[in-house]
């Protein structure tokens, strides 16, 4: 199943200078395969403080296991999608 994920945060809550917080994204990328999640695209619009992902995952629980800690870095919207 394909999913579109979007992380949104503000300039005031931006974590770009905080290596510990940035490491949460690295950890998510590392553990994704263990949770059955394949990251097809990880895209960033730095000036808008937005991260975009297209991932393949068997279910919502797999996404939570992969990206759950990243929810402390702003809002994450996880939407199931299909190819057009």
Q: Model-found features: residue ranges?
A:
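Short cationic amphipathic helices and targeting signals
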Residues: 50-56
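Short S/T/G/P-rich N-terminal loop/turn motif that feeds into the first structured element of a domain
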Residues: 1-34, 38-49, 61, 84
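An amphipathic, aromatic/His-enriched active-site/gating alpha helix that lines ligand/cofactor pockets
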Residues: 26-27, 56-84
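A structural signal for short, well-ordered beta-strand segments
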Residues: 5-7, 53, 78
């Amino acid at each position: 199943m394909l999913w579109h994920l979007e992380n949104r945060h503000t300039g005031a809550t931006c974590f770009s200078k905080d290596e510990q917080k940035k490491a949460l994204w690295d950890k998510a990328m590392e553990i994704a395969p263990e949770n059955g999640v394949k990251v097809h695209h990880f895209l960033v619009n730095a000036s808008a403080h937005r991260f975009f992902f297209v991932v393949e995952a068997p279910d919502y629980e797999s996404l939570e296991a992969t990206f759950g800690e990243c929810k402390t870095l702003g809002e994450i919207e996880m939407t199931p999608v299909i190819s057009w």
